[in-house]
């Protein structure tokens, strides 16, 4: 389902779009994630409820966490795609909307890349166990 901000942008209702984006930017998730030090990936893992793959040796647990990571990345990819579509529609017509969108998009990109790294770690570890 398309987010409210994207619908508002498509309908040229920029006031509603900025209000919806500010809600997202300040919600529990994005509000807290902006405060995380991105050099401290353990904090990010903890916040996203991602495991420390290196410490897991049980194959079934690895497979379970692999599935969790795959689902999480799908969620962020979807949100990232909506934001990218909105950014293209705005095309810097509305600077305030564009700035918020780009910040949120960068956060989603960073998280998506981080989760992709976790998926790769799981795959490598499972491959090493010859599964």
UniProtKB/Swiss-Prot annotation:
Protein name: Uncharacterized protein R58
Source organism of the structure: Acanthamoeba polyphaga mimivirus
């Amino acid at each position: 389902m398309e987010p409210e901000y994207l619908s508002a942008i498509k309908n040229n209702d920029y006031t509603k779009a900025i209000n919806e984006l500010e809600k997202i930017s300040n919600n529990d998730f994005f509000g807290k994630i902006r405060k995380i030090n991105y050099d401290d990936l353990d904090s990010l893992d903890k916040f996203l409820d991602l495991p420390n793959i290196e410490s897991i040796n049980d194959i079934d647990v690895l497979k379970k966490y692999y599935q969790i990571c795959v689902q999480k990345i799908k969620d962020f990819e979807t949100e990232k795609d909506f934001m990218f579509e909105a950014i293209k529609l705005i095309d810097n017509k509305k600077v305030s909307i564009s700035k918020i969108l780009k910040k949120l998009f960068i956060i989603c990109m960073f998280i998506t890349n981080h989760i992709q790294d976790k998926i790769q770690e799981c795959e490598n570890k499972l491959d090493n166990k010859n599964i």
